[in-house]
Amino acid sequence: MKPNMACLKQVSALLLPLLFISFFKPSHAGGISVYWGQNGNEGSLADACNTGNYKYVNIAFLFTFGGGQTPQLNLAGHCNPSINNCNVFSDQIKECQSKDIKVLLSLGGASGSYSLTSADDATQVANYIWNNFLGGQSSSRPLGDAILDGVDFDIESGTGEHWDDLARALKGFNSQLLLTAAPQCPIPDAHLDTAIKTGLFDIVWVQFYNNPPCQYSSGNTNDLISSWNQWTSSQAKQLFLGVPASTAAAGSGFIPADVLTSQVLPTIKGSSKYGGVMLWDRFNDGQSGYSGAIIGSV
């Protein structure tokens, strides 16, 4: 019997997409997050967004708050909040957002003066953040009328108490508000463990640096990847690999770009929670060109 060529062509056309699905796994394409604000020589916020390398920019830091303290923004040499000249960044925030870049307010940092003394204190801080940086209203918004996309918890001092209360209070204003956290890689994190366990954080960008037991060191990726695998079982909805953008950006844990793209990313991208790479920080990235070197592999 002679085969019907028209039917064979139709069957082939139907099977081809199935073959592609069978032989090619879906790609976990990710993005790059960066911290901006702690070096006056790193360029403007708009400069960072105009590189086209970043999907998230964390404005660092709201470094004083809680315990009855007057909240203070610290943007190093960029502006002086005490004379209300940081609102110059309002239009730049909107420009970044127009490029589909999420802009967040980062809380804390390594040297800030912050703490939460009670659940009520957390609620008061949440009210301040909502009214001054997010969708609420205040006559003294430090960054002008721009509405940020979310809040990042970079809590590196004090206790781990009441950060979960702060997360709940912020999500209570808007369930779509983006919440992110930047814990250290040792598990459990000394400050954010309870907060992360709420499951309220959309992204957790873990700091895999300045922590020798769980970072890259001298050609050894085993400790780093082992720690990553442990983090995938956390309540984080999405995980980013946090790394220094240059050797000068951190005391230890720098991963050469070629090692990251050839040895680390191919392994961790197999995780369904993989979201991308977080860089500390914009200044060091500008000096090293790290994001440009890795973006094609992230």
Curated annotation (Swiss-Prot):
GO molecular function, one term: endochitinase activity
Active site: E156 (proton donor)
First-listed, main subcellular location of the protein, grouped into a coarse class: secreted
An individual GO BP term: polysaccharide catabolic process
EC number(s) stated in the UniProt entry for this protein: 3.2.1.14
Residues spanning the signal sequence: 1-29
Catalytic reaction list: Random endo-hydrolysis of N-acetyl-beta-D-glucosaminide (1->4)-beta-linkages in chitin and chitodextrins
Annotated disulfide bonds: C49-C96, C79-C86, C185-C214
Name of the protein described by the UniProt record: Acidic endochitinase
Role, per record: This protein functions as a defense against chitin containing fungal pathogens.
Cellular component terms per the entry's GO annotation: extracellular region
Family that this chain belongs to: Belongs to the glycosyl hydrolase 18 family. Chitinase class II subfamily.
Native organism: Phaseolus angularis
Pfam families cross-referenced by the UniProt entry: Glyco_hydro_18
Inducers of expression: By ethylene.
Domain named GH18: residues: 30-298
PANTHER family tied to this protein: ACIDIC ENDOCHITINASE, ENDOCHITINASE
Coiled-coil ranges from the UniProt annotation: none
Cell compartments where the protein resides: Secreted, Extracellular space
Keywords: Carbohydrate metabolism, Chitin degradation, Disulfide bond, Glycosidase, Hydrolase, Polysaccharide degradation, Secreted, Signal
Cross-referenced InterPro entries: Cts1-like, Glyco_hydro18_cat, Glyco_hydro_18_chit_AS, Glycoside_hydrolase_SF, Glycosyl_Hydrlase18_Chitinase
